Amino acid sequence: MSVAAYKRIMLKLSGEALMGDDSYGINEDVVSRIVAEIAEVNRLGVQVGVVIGGGNIFRGMKGAASGMDRATADYMGMLATVMNAMALADAFRRAQVEARVQSALRIDQVVEPYIRGRAIRHMEEGRVVIFAAGTGNPFFTTDTAAALRGSEMAAQIVLKATKVDGVYTADPKKDPQAQRYHRISFDEAIGRNLAVLDATAFALCRDQKLPINVFSIFKPGALKRVVLGEDEGTLVHS
């Protein structure tokens, strides 16, 4: 049996990842595939937390740019993450994997409120915990929520699931000579002005010495390879 390199992980999953090739909303086939990948890692004995974005339904920054009050737009974005979290939890149910949703905004009739001790207990008992509503505060991204929850849960790594298979020296879509960084330190990433997470999230991970791995969620088996400690994605470390 494969031995995981990490006992507890915090996976940052963007809302856009749930769209697949659609222009909006939730693509059930894509969700089922992502859930199957997470379930495979969970069966290795890895404790999994997931922070989900909401950009496939509503983006607070975009709403604010169109003239909406920024705080209102951000709260709407948080509610979008709750919808995504519920869709993920239902997909886990269908895959016969126990999962719980905890929301930083209280919606007690629908999902659990975020309670740190309860979340840790769920993870210790093998349940996947999906953290919704970001940090519960406007002006903070779901990247920051992933760094925060990762720190609170004592995760050993934050995994940022993206559309590209790591951090590159340049945009690989524009520059065919772009090279993927296999490993890079926090200080090197800052010095080279690499966009790994947003600045607040990045600073929190750096201060907590919480490593980050940026990888492609659309590459089959990539999540498992990251968890096994193989050369997948880009590892950002202290």
UniProtKB/Swiss-Prot annotation:
Homohexamer. Belongs to the UMP kinase family. Its EC number is 2.7.4.22. The lineage of its organism: Bacteria, Pseudomonadati, Pseudomonadota, Betaproteobacteria, Rhodocyclales. Pathway: Pyrimidine metabolism; CTP biosynthesis via de novo pathway; UDP from UMP (UMPK route): step 1/1. InterPro entries: AceGlu_kinase-like_sf, Asp/Glu/Uridylate_kinase, Uridylate_kinase, Uridylate_kinase_bac. Keywords: ATP-binding, Cytoplasm, Kinase, Nucleotide-binding, Pyrimidine biosynthesis, Transferase. This is Uridylate kinase. The keyword Nucleotide-binding applies. One of its GO terms (molecular function) is UMP kinase activity. It is an enzyme of class 2 (transferase). It catalyses: UMP + ATP = UDP + ADP. Inhibited by UTP. CDD domains: AAK_UMPK-PyrH-Ec.
